[in-house]
């Protein structure tokens, strides 16, 4: 494992957002959803593609808090311009479990 400096870590903006929309993304190469995530007044709403269809249904995602990287460059994924990277962990079968705060925190709160 490569070590990084504290300065490297602090450059990554991991923020809390609330999923306000989730819909299938049929144009994606692998099964995915298009998520709309609200990061509060400072950052607003951003879109992301998330390969989480094995574990979550769209209706179960709306209203959930998630942790996302918000300072990566935007990335074109098929017809979608992804504006953040929603984070998660893969289980033994490769299914993604979302990284979520275990308490209610303000939208846009930064991981410290």
Segments from the language model and where they lie:
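Phosphate-backbone binding interfaces of nucleic-acid-interacting proteins
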Residues: 1-112
């Amino acid at each position: 494992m490569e070590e990084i400096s504290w300065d490297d870590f602090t450059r990554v903006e991991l923020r809390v957002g609330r999923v306000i929309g989730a819909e299938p993304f049929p144009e994606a190469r692998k099964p995915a959803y298009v998520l709309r995530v609200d990061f509060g007044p400072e950052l607003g709403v951003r879109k992301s593609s998330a390969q989480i269809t094995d574990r979550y249904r769209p209706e179960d995602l709306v209203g959930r808090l998630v942790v996302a990287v918000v300072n990566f460059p935007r990335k074109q994924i098929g017809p979608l311009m992804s504006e953040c990277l929603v984070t998660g962990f893969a289980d033994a079968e490769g299914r993604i479990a979302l990284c979520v705060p275990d308490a209610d925190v303000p939208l846009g709160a930064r991981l410290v």
